[in-house]
Amino acid sequence: MALVKSKPTSPGRRFVVKTKDARLHQGGPYEPLVVQKSKTGGRNSNGRITTRHRGGGHKQRYRQIDFKRNKTGVPGKVERLEYDPNRSANIALVLYQDGERRYIIAPRGVEPGSPIQSGRDAAIKPGNALPLRNIPVGTQVHCVELKPGKGAQLARSAGAGVQVVARESGMATLRLRSGEMRRVPADCMATVGEVGNAEHSLRNLGKAGAKRHLGVRPTVRGVAMNPVDHPHGGGEGRTAGGRHPVSPWGMPTKGHKTRKNKRTDKYIVRRRKR
């Protein structure tokens, strides 16, 4: 993995920093694991915007990722590493001994040809998936389930990792990158190691058009709008908004707690840092 800086041949190229990985497969994806993906533009079935700042972008196809890692007892080998337009992490195509191929999130340190295995008896090596009860305390893991068999939900983005800090009475305590300490069932599957492509956070797109290629539309400040569009809008000349920062719907923002899932509060040992 290397960072490539562009020469300032134009204003749009001056600050561009991209990542380059010679290990990535240069061809197309493995077709049996690819499905069509239609864009929503941030709209729901009623045509109303439910997620702002989405629209346009390059056409993408979805790669079906094995987040459950339920191929237990069958050894596999990483066939190749690939770019995935749907996520910040790279993905690895694994060929198992029975002939089946599956995509997984590519961990750091896994190369083409690396052995991969899932199950209680798998070795504690990057890329292998085990139940949390079989992973030693202090180990860094990623792609962690919150419910056994549901599939990985935690630590799936580039460079992400979670540390197993304790295990007792059928529950494992994890320390997340945000500083949150959370308890999950010890039967949940997790993959050893950290997610690769950690340099993703160091890239600089350099121009607005590159962001539009990703399907991201501009973010307009509330104070630049009219009063009908935002609580901060309106006023003669430039104003500071006249109130504490709020969303377009009047909800406090910038530090206001919005978590509402009280049902799972009992699993959070320590809240994340703010």
Swiss-Prot record:
One of its GO terms (biological process) is cytoplasmic translation. It holds the Pfam family Ribosomal_L2_C. PROSITE patterns: RIBOSOMAL_L2 (PS00467). GO terms for molecular function: rRNA binding; structural constituent of ribosome; transferase activity. Residues 50-61, 254-274 have a biased composition (Basic residues). Residues 36-61, 223-274 are annotated as: Disordered. Residues 37-46 have a biased composition (Polar residues). GO terms for cellular component: large ribosomal subunit. Keywords: Ribonucleoprotein, Ribosomal protein, RNA-binding, rRNA-binding. Belongs to the universal ribosomal protein uL2 family. One of the primary rRNA binding proteins. Required for association of the 30S and 50S subunits to form the 70S ribosome, for tRNA binding and peptide bond formation. It has been suggested to have peptidyltransferase activity; this is somewhat controversial. Makes several contacts with the 16S rRNA in the 70S ribosome. Part of the 50S ribosomal subunit. Forms a bridge to the 30S subunit in the 70S ribosome. This is Large ribosomal subunit protein uL2. The gene is rplB.
